[in-house]
Design a protein with these regions (language model features):
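Glycine-rich phosphate-binding loop signature in dinucleotide/nucleotide-binding domains
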Residues: 35-39, 119-120, 162-165, 284-286
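Divalent metal-coordination and catalytic microenvironments
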Residues: 8, 28, 48, 63, ...
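Binuclear metal-dependent phosphoesterase catalytic core
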Residues: 112-124, 129, 222-287
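A short helix->loop->beta-strand "cap" motif at the edges of active sites that frequently abuts
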Residues: 72-77, 166
Length: 380
């Protein structure tokens, strides 16, 4: 049996306030063309079907169209909700959808029940596990020692051990320790939401969603397929692809990928304003791509964003890299150490460790902790 592994469609997503819906429709049409050329026996959709828990109507219509196209091709679909999705909304109508062989994970209420498939090699069981938080698992099994995300997943898998005589697939949406992240993902401070890859040892293949870079974790058969489109400039150098998984006898799994070509690439460009507006430099190039332009001019160019968009209409982000900006970024610790706040110290450390700034929510949480620590010190 052969399957297509997809995840993190993020339908309805906006990047730098640009709607990605047309690009998403384009890439889904390309995926359908791939399926027409390369027949499969089913499709895994490993979460984050939408970008928000309450998606825009256009995104709902796009997912409806895509699932209908898969059903018309008589392809079973195995879908779960991710951390960006509303599990309740994703699960709506799931009992009816099963009549069209579209299997959607219900709202988490206990160990998933395997969906059996058969071929000449025997039975293949598919387990659908939506995005988990420890509180969800404690609610179902209050007597189990569940404190962390790793505890939560371990608890669930203890209650649904795969049949060792069958081939087994787990479709899940978690952050596995050791995987590489991108700016467009939500990852908790210190990796507290990570789970250990050893929890998946009993499964022949683990179809993961959540991380946007295509990658294996620990072994080839524990895999993130990545997003079908680039959703941040940290992904600019990535090559997106569709992941195909083929199962033979028990333990025999082969993985191949097919490249995906977006309607508009997402690229980073740098140079002086004069260079970037010289027709000889941009004629014949993909000026409609989504761009992050870094100007190297020492003096700011008046109204540069609007003027550049005359040539590059999908310019998403504009920065400068010059003597002034480099000096602004420079931190001279001995001179500033006593003048910056504890939160600023921690923010700089977090940025250095994670290559991304604290979110507003994380900063507020840290500030609250700092104030509590200071108060305890004063009261001591």
């Amino acid at each position: 049996m052969r399957f297509l592994h997809l995840s993190d469609l993020h339908l309805g997503k906006r990047v730098c306030e640009f709607s990605m819906l047309d690009d998403q429709r384009f890439i889904l049409e390309q995926i359908l063309s791939l399926l027409d050329e390369t027949p499969v026996d089913g499709v895994f959709l490993a979460g984050d079907l939408y970008d928000k828990p309450v998606p825009p109507a256009e995104a709902v219509r796009l997912l409806d169209w895509f699932l209908t196209q898969l059903a018309e091709r008589q392809l079973p679909v195995f879908a779960i909700s991710g951390n960006h999705d509303s599990a309740d909304r994703i699960a709506f109508g799931s009992a009816l959808l099963q009549n069209s062989r579209v299997y959607v994970s219900p709202v988490f209420s206990g160990a998933p029940v395997p969906i059996p498939l058969t071929d000449e090699y025997g039975t293949l069981d598919v387990y659908l596990l939506p995005f988990l938080k420890p509180a969800m698992v404690r609610h179902v099994w209050p007597d189990e020692p569940v404190e962390s995300y790793n505890d939560a997943l371990a608890c669930v898998l203890r209650h649904c051990p795969p049949d060792p005589a069958h081939r087994s697939v787990l479709v899940a949406h978690q952050f596995v320790a050791g995987a590489a992240c991108c700016e467009s993902e939500e990852v908790s401070v210190g990796g507290v939401d990570s789970v250990d890859t050893s929890l998946f040892d009993a499964f022949d293949y683990v179809a993961l969603g959540h991380l946007h870079s295509p990658q294996k974790v620990s072994r080839d058969a524990v895999r993130y397929c990545g997003t079908p489109l680039k959703y941040s400039f940290s992904e600019a150098d990535q090559h997106k692809s569709a992941t195909f998984v083929e199962f033979g006898l028990k333990g025999e799994v082969s993985i191949t990928t097919a490249p995906l070509t977006p309607k508009h690439d997402l690229r980073e460009v740098r140079g002086s304003y004069m260079e970037l507006t010289d027709r000889r430099n941009y004629d014949g190039t993909a000026v409609d791509d989504y761009l992050h332009i870094t100007l190297t001019d020492e003096q700011d160019v008046p109204d540069a964003l609007a003027r550049l968009r005359v040539i590059y209409p999908n310019l998403m982000r504009l920065d400068y890299d010059n003597l002034r900006t480099r000096e602004d970024q420079e931190i001279t610790a001995p001179e500033r150490a006593e003048s910056i706040t504890p939160l600023e110290h921690f923010s700089a450390f977090y940025q250095l460790q994670n290559n991304q700034p604290l979110t507003a929510e994380q900063a507020a949480f840290c500030q609250q902790l700092i104030e509590e620590i200071w108060k305890e010190g004063e009261d001591a």
